[in-house]
Amino acid sequence: VLKLDIREVHYEMGESSTACCPIALALTEKFLGTHPSETSIWKKNGIPLFRGEVVKVFTEYTRFWHPIKNKIYEFNHDEKIQKFIIEFDDWYESSADMKTLPLEETTINFPKPTCVWKSELGLHQPQFL
């Protein structure tokens, strides 16, 4: 199981609430070109409907007047997810600035949002290629 801990540090989407468009949604659309609803593992009574290796994305987000909220997205580790991992890997390797940062904490700047990745295992490690 590959786990990604994604912690939001800034969010400016013009949404009524950050829950309307969490980071996992933006990242999935950015790298996979698809909406998470097409690849996510839906559960019935807490039991995954799909079997196999799972990629879990943990998000944490807040607004001025809201307490911190957490949400977990689970994705089947299929070709689309593998494509995401490879693309992230390529991006990491090609970024000179990123190589000076600790492996456990990587910042990725998108037009919106800005986020901090905390990867338990590290996407750039060879065993995930």
Model-derived regions: residue spans:
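Domain-length accessory/inserted modules outside core catalytic folds
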Residues: 1-129
